[in-house]
Amino acid sequence: MLGQIVGGLIGGHHDSKKVKGTVVMMKKNALDFTDLAGSLTDKIFEALGQKVSFQLISSVQSDPANGLQGKHSNPAYLENFLFTLTPLAAGETAFGVTFDWNEEFGVPGAFIIKNTHINEFFLKSLTLEDVPNHGKVHFVCNSWVYPSFRYKSDRIFFANQPYLPSETPELLRKYRENELLTLRGDGTGKREAWDRIYDYDVYNDLGNPDQGKENVRTTLGGSADYPYPRRGRTGRPPTRTDPKSESRIPLILSLDIYVPRDERFGHLKMSDFLTYALKSIVQFILPELHALFDGTPNEFDSFEDVLRLYEGGIRLPQGPLFKALTDAIPLEMIRELLRTDGEGILRFPTPLVIKDSKTAWRTDEEFAREMLAGVNPIIISRLQEFPPKSKLDPEAYGNQNSTITAEHIEDKLDGLTVDEAMNNNKLFILNHHDVLIPYLRRINTTTTKTYASRTLLFLQDNGSLKPLAIELSLPHPDGDQFGVTSKVYTPSDQGVESSIWQLAKAYVAVNDSGVHQLISHWLNTHAVIEPFVIATNRQLSVLHPIHKLLYPHFRDTMNINAMARQILINAGGVLESTVFPSKFAMEMSAVVYKDWVFPDQALPADLVKRGVAVEDSSSPHGVRLLIEDYPYAVDGLEIWSAIKSWVTDYCSFYYGSDEEILKDNELQAWWKELREVGHGDKKNEPWWPEMETPQELIDSCTTIIWIASALHAAVNFGQYPYAGYLPNRPTVSRRFMPEPGTPEYEELKKNPDKAFLKTITAQLQTLLGVSLIEILSRHTTDEIYLGQRESPEWTKDKEPLAAFDKFGKKLTDIEKQIIQRNGDNILINRSGPVNAPYTLLFPTSEGGLTGKGIPNSVSI
């Protein structure tokens, strides 16, 4: 009798069975190489009895000694760890593990792992091959496990069966709650590499006041003047000279900036990323060395001078034999250096915009087309009042309304009056005026000399846009309250007026380039999505269905944003060095964030808000485009609808009523924290969804996924194809429009190309900017695209798996439709004069510089 009681208490081992499992893990590595010294040390620890143990946790059998939580199995250990050869190249290794199991224990719902080695390892998965009466049980882990002494609580992983909080097996609830508490931390202390804590902070680490006044930057976030989304907290100490500014780590340690360990790039991505950087540095340095022996070392003397950046280089052999050899190389960095896609090394790849023609980029048709199918197709709007009016406060900025008149444009409206053209939805505007004017006076005190622009366009019968007029404005010399001084330019193809028109378009491109980088790209994708990453990990358990839905769309975002704060958007960083707002760049983006509205990030809402579409319930996506051949919008609506259909199927499986949404305490805490902390500077905005209905959840999750995947792809991966040739999208202008009677005007008449190149981005800035966007435009080899998952076992629920499979098939159909549209000669905006088919919303891609592919997340 006593034996039965004891046997029951210890798990009934008299009828125990063996359950085999497979552990997939990757040892600590340095880029492509396994840390052999660390691996040897771990083997020594293993030989001394310091092992890696696993204990299953029952979801049905309680343990009185453990507060009636799920009972733990006896520890099981990795098998043959000592005798498994350590590969030189970093990669996954599978180990067996055998557990004692009995009928009373039932199905395991989680397991605890204890690493008593000295080094961390990456735990990919544990699969129990055949739990009696339950079959296979999968635990998808994808987490770095440090030595146990680094943690204050046990490392726990849950099986792939999702549960809403109220449906969680009683014996697993405490484990679920405690894991979330661990991930939240207590908001104190400096974060270390092994910490798994997600927390918030303001952008108070962009400047470095300890290095002088010129390196001071405004804190973004936490104020009405400069609101901003929150970033991940690092807990670094304050600077010596300003206790409100966070100190910075040395540039050489940039890769070590804190993000939770599981948010860091994987070894394949890090290898690709550093290889791309190495190649770009070489491509950057060689022209600079040549320039030392040039009479004008910081100037391109001609367009031929610019083109030499791309032509030549060392061409590696191509063909199946060489490809087979490189594919067999285990080291990703070397494989990437020896790419067989035809790219030369030691020269920049030829950007798509000049591949077919070296001059088509200069046409008015291409200038306008890129507003619909270029790298920044999300700004153009329909003109709804003429002349265009400013929304800036007239008390502070005077009269900012446009000086464009009907006389400037009516001869180009195919016989229509301005009112008739507007009423027929024929007039459109690219408007950068109000965003730039408040900062333009200060910007022009730097080496930048530029304008705020308005560009009017006419929708022609063939579906293309025709530029009508460009207005360039400067703050009034007597003060902001006196408004602006403006000049209007109209198209010309004759003499010096033609050269002036080309310069006017260049100033517009400079405006658009800066707005693209700071707002369309950085603010509207990178910055706004980070609070969602943090809140999801803090408030939604990995068991939560919505965590499982959103998790793939947050991959690598915190890491790339942290690196951006360290080397790109910081004081004196690459962004300040290459875009026209210079040191005012990030502050400008905070002012623009004042107008950010979460529901308006949904593609249909955005199109309607910009007036380029109208609501129409009879249209396939609920809106009708007023520019029918609008490649970004056409492809985007297909992608948007596919995402929404997938999210609807998924969420409807778990939530059938408003009550189920309201009683989900994790979901409500998640949304509350997003509003009040993550985007806390906008917490009182009336437009926030209340998260009270399944439809609000569906709409919100669709928008989050859209921002992280398709919107980012549309504004990121076209950077090199369109802006890799800087004359097409200059980032800086260095002098104003030449005035008659000046030496600059005479130069413009005699040598318009040289005058153009002396006006836009200088040679050094060009090389730096092109090097950066080449890196940012590449896909890494481990990229996971929309409609794909890292593991096929991401959930146990069959209906969501079937819905996800349907989503993938829909995306494949969309790819076929994009190919078909790109081959339709009637749709002239799909390729344009430069013959560059629109593929930025083509869902999949191979690695490298492809100009297509929608990664799941903001990952670069």
Curated annotation (Swiss-Prot):
It is found in: Cytoplasm. This is Probable linoleate 9S-lipoxygenase 4. It comes from Solanum tuberosum (Potato). Monomer. The keyword DNA-binding does not apply. Binds 1 Fe cation per subunit. Iron is tightly bound. Plant lipoxygenases may be involved in a number of diverse aspects of plant physiology including growth and development, pest resistance, and senescence or responses to wounding. Catalyzes the hydroperoxidation of lipids containing a cis,cis-1,4-pentadiene structure. Pfam families: Lipoxygenase (PF00305), PLAT (PF01477). GO terms for biological process: fatty acid biosynthetic process; lipid oxidation; oxylipin biosynthetic process. Fe cation binds at residues 521, 526, 712, 716, 860. Expressed in tubers and roots. Not detected in leaves, flowers, stems, shoot tips, or axillary buds. InterPro entries: LipOase (IPR000907), LipOase_C (IPR013819), LipOase_C_sf (IPR036226), LipOase_CS (IPR020834), LipOase_Fe_BS (IPR020833), LipOase_plant (IPR001246), Lipoxy_PLAT/LH2 (IPR042057), Lipoxygenase_dom_3 (IPR027433). Residues 29-159 form the PLAT domain. It catalyses: (9Z,12Z)-octadecadienoate + O2 = (9S)-hydroperoxy-(10E,12Z)-octadecadienoate. Residues 209-246 are annotated as: Disordered. Keywords: Cytoplasm, Dioxygenase, Fatty acid biosynthesis, Fatty acid metabolism, Iron, Lipid biosynthesis, Lipid metabolism, Metal-binding, Oxidoreductase, Oxylipin biosynthesis. It is an enzyme of class 1 (oxidoreductase). Belongs to the lipoxygenase family. The keyword Glycoprotein does not apply. Its EC number is 1.13.11.58. GO terms for molecular function: linoleate 9S-lipoxygenase activity; metal ion binding; oxidoreductase activity, acting on single donors with incorporation of molecular oxygen, incorporation of two atoms of oxygen. One of its GO terms (cellular component) is cytoplasm. Pathway: Lipid metabolism; oxylipin biosynthesis. Residues 162-860 form the Lipoxygenase domain. Its cofactor is Fe cation.
